[in-house]
């Protein structure tokens, strides 16, 4: 995304920026100062000029050999020096990030308290310097304009914004699809559920024929669960972080399936317990390092749950703005079938034993233990009326983010293909928060986890595939992408009987 930034970030007076990797291309280490040629990253100059009327700007950068004057001379070459009210280098303050002195000095020069400042950077040390100074931080994963948009959305409440923009599916487009199918060169109803899918796509997008999705993307949200330590899974929690790294290296099942069907994979750290640094290809939106053990009490606070909902909504909105026209849900989190079962039981008022499955293949003893934990956790939600309170009590960060992802897809009239039991739990949360949100979704497949079928039944969704999958990651939903594309293509490219007579 290289578009300009057009609005202020609520609660922020000063925006501080790292330089190398954030404003300009990172120079090769050891390059002599005299040989440095600043090359602005795409959209940076335009974005800074659009931002300047709304916020005071400054830069905080690590360099062992350049003082403020030398750095400003380089920035003047790309026309942004005049926009920066303060430029602080590690050479000037005698400390590199994550030491907060550079951030604090920039805030002092600009006359603002650190809690009213936002630092934007591309490295883990930038994030840690902001935290140590008490400032906000956003990673420049997808360009400066995108980082600013995410910062603004998170301050305003991206989920609430998306929820307010959701409208009912288009009944006229649905009827137009039915009418067109009746005119196509085939017996009425002979394409079976493919016709139903075409009608649904028309209603979701508000267009008949519906657009043929050409840029599908799988949003894989990763988070850890305190309940994983309670004996509900044979896998160690560290597997979550290892799999996130595997996704980044494109070596996981979802990467292979996505390549086959022409989809992009976007991985988001919303709550992995381990510090992942700033791995390339990962969006770093960690709300907290994993949830607490839901066997002992609430998995998280309602503030955590709402923050994760915002993350999902922000990511979906950004992906749609980048031109993606089909959203697919994916996830990773050791132990996450336990909170999913708890959410499904609580939100569908189904007996926990009926929705709790074997997850990664646990034995009978572990299943009985897992079911007891789910039963006790669900009992704590009996008096809750607010779905966010239920989500906070027994849910997960990646599940919350998926719920936000789904709602933002609906807000943008983009179809969302949901995956297995984790995604079904997220969709139940989304549907409890925004009426009839499931109308905007397509069930990609039926997971072999028992809770998935119960959730789909309550949501009124019939899955496109039933391959006895239980991996997650978005694999089943991703496999359904060609079917979704075909349903739209049929409405575009089949001739009508009237056209045959011409």
Where are the language model's segments positioned?
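Asp-based phosphoryl-transfer active-site loop
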Residues: 8-28, 327
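Metal-dependent phosphoesterase signature
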Residues: 25-42
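Short amphipathic alpha-helical segments
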Residues: 28-30, 70-73, 130-133, 232-233, ...
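Conserved Rossmann-like nucleotide-cofactor binding loop
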Residues: 22, 125, 273
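Asp-based, Mg2+/Mn2+-dependent phosphohydrolase catalytic module
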Residues: 1-17, 38, 45, 49-50, ...
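Gly/Thr-rich phosphate-binding beta-strand-loop-beta motif of the actin/hexokinase/Hsp70
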Residues: 16-18, 25, 130, 320, ...
């Amino acid at each position: 995304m290289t578009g300009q930034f057009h609005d202020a970030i609520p609660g922020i007076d000063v925006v501080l920026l790292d330089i190398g990797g954030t404003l300009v291309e990172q120079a090769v280490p050891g390059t002599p100062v005299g040989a440095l040629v600043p090359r602005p990253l795409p959209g940076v100059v335009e974005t800074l000029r659009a931002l300047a009327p709304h916020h005071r700007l400054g830069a905080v950068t690590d360099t062992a050999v350049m003082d403020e004057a030398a750095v400003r001379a380089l920035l003047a070459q790309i026309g942004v020096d005049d926009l920066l009210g303060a430029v602080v280098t590690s050479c000037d303050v005698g400390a590199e990030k994550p030491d907060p002195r550079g951030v604090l000095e920039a805030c002092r020069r600009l006359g603002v308290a650190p809690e009213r400042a936002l630092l934007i950077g591309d490295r883990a040390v930038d994030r840690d310097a902001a935290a140590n100074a008490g400032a906000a931080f956003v990673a420049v994963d997808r360009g400066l304009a995108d980082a600013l948009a995410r910062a603004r959305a998170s301050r305003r409440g991206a989920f609430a914004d998306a929820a307010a923009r959701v409208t009912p599916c288009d009944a006229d487009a649905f009827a137009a699809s039915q009418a067109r199918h009746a005119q196509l060169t085939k017996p009425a109803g002979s394409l079976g559920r493919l016709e139903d899918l075409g009608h649904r796509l028309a209603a979701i997008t508000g267009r008949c024929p519906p657009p043929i999705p050409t840029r599908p993307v799988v949003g894989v949200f990763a988070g850890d669960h305190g309940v994983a330590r309670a004996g509900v899974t044979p896998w160690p929690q560290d597997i979550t972080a290892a799999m996130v790294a595997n996704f980044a290296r494109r070596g996981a099942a979802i990467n292979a399936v996505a390549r086959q069907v022409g989809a992009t994979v976007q991985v988001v750290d919303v709550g992995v317990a381990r510090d992942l640094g700033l791995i390339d290809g990962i969006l770093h939106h960690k709300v907290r390092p994993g949830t607490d053990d839901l066997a002992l009490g609430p998995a998280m606070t309602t503030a955590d749950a709402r923050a994760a909902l915002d993350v999902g909504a922000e990511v979906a909105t950004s992906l749609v703005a980048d031109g993606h026209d089909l959203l697919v849900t994916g996830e990773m989190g050791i132990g996450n079938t336990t909170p999913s079962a708890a959410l499904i039981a609580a939100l569908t008022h189904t007996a926990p034993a009926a929705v709790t499955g074997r997850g990664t293949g646990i034995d009978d003893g572990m299943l009985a233990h897992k079911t007891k934990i789910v039963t006790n956790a669900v009992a704590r939600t009996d008096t809750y009326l607010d779905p966010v309170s239920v989500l906070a009590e027994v849910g997960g960060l990646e599940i919350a983010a998926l719920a936000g992802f789904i709602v933002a897809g609906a807000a943008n009239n983009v179809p969302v293909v949901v995956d297995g039991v984790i995604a079904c739990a997220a969709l139940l949360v989304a549907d409890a928060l925004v009426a009839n949100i499931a109308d905007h979704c397509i069930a990609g497949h039926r997971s072999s986890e028992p809770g998935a079928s119960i959730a789909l039944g309550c949501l009124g969704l019939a899955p496109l595939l039933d391959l006895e999958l239980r991996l997650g990651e978005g694999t089943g939903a991703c496999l359904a992408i060609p079917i979704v594309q075909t349903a739209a293509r049929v409405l575009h490219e089949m001739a009508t009987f009237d056209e045959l007579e011409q």
